[in-house]
């Protein structure tokens, strides 16, 4: 059990039978009321983000998560296959377990597979990934780096906003936390 006063970003906790990671934490002290702790939590199974307020004297169970580096192999149906980089053991995760992470998976990419009580429960993506643009409007003459933006569909099916000078076939660096264009690769 861990006190809610000891929360920090990145901490994993168990709440209502689900595993959550703390994204943001704020200690709030009311003038005449009891202090509270407001947290933003991400469900590691579904990817849903919730906000929750705890009383400052509450305790919650800490979830101990193990990580193993693995390479994404392929998708079959709604199952995604990974191979451990050290033991060469294969892991199978469902689309539901991966959530939004499927938008960044490309065969051969290395990710961290998250384990809780010996079972794979999800993955942790690198901060950025390189993906190819497969569909976007053509750039017009005079488009500059400081211009506007346009939607672009990437090889995984993800659609993001990119600068006007990006063309089909360009490789772009995408921030996996915010689904945003970073730079041309």
From Swiss-Prot:
GO biological process, one term: peptide biosynthetic process
Compartment(s) of residence: Cytoplasm
Keyword set includes Transmembrane helix: no
Gene Ontology MF: a single term: translation elongation factor activity
SUPFAM superfamilies found in the cross-reference section: Nucleic acid-binding proteins, Translation proteins SH3-like domain
Domain of life: Bacteria
Pfam families the record matches: EFP, EFP_N, Elong-fact-P_C
Pathway info: Protein biosynthesis; polypeptide chain elongation
Cellular component, GO, one term: cytoplasm
SMART domains: EFP, Elong-fact-P_C
Keywords: Cytoplasm, Elongation factor, Protein biosynthesis
Major localization class: cytoplasm
Coiled coil: none
Function: Involved in peptide bond synthesis. Stimulates efficient translation and peptide-bond synthesis on native or reconstituted 70S ribosomes in vitro. Probably functions indirectly by altering the affinity of the ribosome for aminoacyl-tRNA, thus increasing their reactivity as acceptors for peptidyl transferase.
Record-linked PANTHER family: ELONGATION FACTOR P, ELONGATION FACTOR P (EF-P) FAMILY PROTEIN
Family: Belongs to the elongation factor P family.
Protein name: Elongation factor P
Organism expressing this protein natively: Dictyoglomus thermophilum (strain ATCC 35947 / DSM 3960 / H-6-12)
UniProt lineage: Bacteria, Pseudomonadati, Dictyoglomota, Dictyoglomia, Dictyoglomales
Designated gene of the protein: efp
């Amino acid at each position: 059990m861990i006190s809610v006063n000891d929360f920090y970003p990145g901490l994993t906790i168990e709440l209502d039978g689900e595993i959550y990671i703390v994204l943001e934490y704020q200690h709030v002290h009311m003038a005449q009321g009891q202090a509270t702790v407001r947290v933003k939590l991400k469900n590691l199974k579904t990817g849903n983000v919730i906000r929750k307020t705890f009383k400052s004297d509450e305790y919650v169970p800490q979830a101990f998560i193990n990580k193993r580096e693995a390479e994404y192999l392929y998708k079959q149906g709604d199952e995604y296959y990974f191979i451990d980089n050290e033991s060469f053991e294969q892991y199978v995760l469902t689309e539901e377990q991966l959530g939004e992470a499927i938008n960044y998976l490309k065969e051969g990419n290395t990710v961290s597979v998250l384990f809780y009580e010996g079972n794979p429960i999800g993955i942790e993506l690198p901060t950025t990934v390189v993906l190819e643009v497969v569909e976007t409007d053509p750039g017009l003459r005079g488009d500059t780096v400081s211009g506007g933006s346009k939607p672009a569909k990437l090889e995984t099916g993800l659609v993001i906003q990119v600068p006007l000078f990006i063309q089909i076939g360009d490789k772009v660096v995408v921030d996996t936390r915010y689904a945003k264009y970073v730079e041309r690769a």
